[in-house]
């Protein structure tokens, strides 16, 4: 054999082998070592998914680990996303808009529920009968969450300003405790704490408005979505499995909610009965709902003056991933 021919072809084979190795390495690097998600008592879908381990099952063959972190509210989930402590976080839609407007690079990619998860509550024997009666009163709410924004919108439509009341900033569970101990006059509650307070302490719903409850959004960091689009799809596929299971098994879902959140089955049933799991396809409907709700963020100086909230909302909502779950459904 010609020596030059041998050397040339040996070199080509070596380069081909290196190229193959690099290709394999690149493919391996295209998947993360770990997917980090939150779970939340206000998101029954996350509890069912965590309970059955369906995401772990789905990514096991890829060698990807799954890590779960408890979120006590939208504000916590958004803090974790901003700090890169989690890749996926469960929040209310308007809370996600507020966070994105203030610089948190997230994308909302899935609707895990359409809940009536917040309302204004007062103690069972309270003399307060209307929202107007709240003037000069102490009201607990968790800043940066749907209940807080619900409170601001409720005050506005009832002719009150934020300065007309004293807002006490407490996490959801602490707000419930403060209401039941008489330290505050009213509370912008969140399920399941709200349902627990109704059933166990007799707390009374003072003001309800389903339209002021924004959707439950699953958010992902922009960085994760860009680097690992296939894993975003895998997470949504797992969420879909959990959502469909809840629709088919409401009693069992209530029991899982009760066990995970450490609440009574009766409370869990109340929470699930006022939660709509029918439409996960994020898109136009959700943009329009958020555009209608967003002005309160500017009116209350929660975002910088001049912020283009329509652009923020359009940049936030990304239907491209959920469309792959059901091509015949239009999410745009």
Regions found by a protein language model. Give the residues of each.
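N-terminal secretory signal peptides and thylakoid transit peptides that target proteins
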Residues: 1-15
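Sec/Tat signal peptide C-region and signal peptidase I cleavage site
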Residues: 24-28
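Short, glycine-/small- and polar/acidic-enriched structural segments
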Residues: 29-161, 166-169, 185-188, 205, ...
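Solvent-exposed, polar/charged alpha-helical surfaces in well-ordered, non-transmembrane soluble domains
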Residues: 57, 79, 83, 97, ...
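Sec/Tat-exported extracytoplasmic proteins
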Residues: 59, 85, 90, 100, ...
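Pocket-lining segment of extracytoplasmic ligand-binding domains
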Residues: 94, 167-168, 173-259
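Secondary-structure end/capping motifs
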Residues: 228-304
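Conserved C-terminal helix/tail region of periplasmic/extracytoplasmic solute-binding proteins
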Residues: 298-332
